[in-house]
Amino acid sequence: MTRMKILTEAELRGIVPLDREAVACVEDAFRALATKAVAMPPILRLDIPEHRGEVDVKTAYVPGLDGFAIKISPGFFDNPKIGLPSTNGMMVLLSSKTGLVQALLLDNGYLTDVRTAAAGAVAARRLSREDSSVAAVFGAGMQARLQLEALALVRPIREARIWARDAAKAEAAAIALGGKLGFAVKAETDPRAAITGADIIVTTTPSETPVLKAEWLEPGQHVTAMGSDAEHKNEIDPHAIARATYVADSLKQTRRLGELHHAIAAHLMSAEAEFPELGQVIAGLKPGRTRADEITIADLTGTGIQDTAIATLAFARANAADAGTTFES
């Protein structure tokens, strides 16, 4: 007889908020990627272009952990037009010792949202100036909102600007976040105005053409690029990648999917060039920011190790809280 715990999105929201422990667990995962024999195969992705849809499958095994996660993550970006969320999905946590299913996490993409925001916080903590207090976010969806919440966990944010192609959504997000976070959040109609004087810039859009131009960047700024997780997506001007200190979540992945991919295609960067990975910066194996006036860019395409990390945290918290439903077969 095997036992499996099943957790719904509502239950997971109750036990896995976006907090400092979630940020720490994702940071530990990146460190493990740089220091342990992690097994992390390439992302499996299915594109469904006629419906602006894609499905990603990610996984990773970390030596020493009792379990590993396999995540199925659909993104259908026209769904809001018919009243549905653009992302959903689930994670399956399996035993590293037996391969048996330990938990089915029916999170509808919630855990992905949390671990992605946590990764943004890790990148900002490791690459932005410690006194960074002004943030600019491109996008007005759930991830844009969570990225700003995550930044507030690691930096003394006192002001934020939000820009999105849909000005009404940017305004709504600014109002909601200003009330929740307790500092000034303003919607901007011009993307350049949004980043002028900002210390940290986070891009969270599914754009296929750059929304952040190289000539807009100022000395000392840090950029976290979240949206380019497929070959056709491109938020950052490739010239900005060539100009800045560049850090990848997974260099093997960003050469194929991320903003680096577009800089290589534009012949601004060599496909063979070596760049630091975030885990190497965390572990002290490679430098991150070395000067206050340096422009840094973190290219985060999303990794399976983040999913295993957040699923493991969710399972531990569920057991501690006796949450979820146990299914026996």
Curated annotation (Swiss-Prot):
GO cellular component: cytoplasm
EC numbers: 1.-.-.-
InterPro entries: Ectoine_EutC, NAD(P)-bd_dom_sf, ODC_Mu_crystall, ODC_N
Molecular function (Gene Ontology), one example: oxidoreductase activity
UniProt KW Oxidoreductase keyword: yes
Keywords: NAD, Oxidoreductase, Plasmid
UniProt record similarity statement: Belongs to the ornithine cyclodeaminase/mu-crystallin family.
Official protein name in the record: Putative dehydrogenase RB0419
Leading EC class: oxidoreductase
Lineage: Bacteria, Pseudomonadati, Pseudomonadota, Alphaproteobacteria, Hyphomicrobiales
Lineage: superkingdom: Bacteria
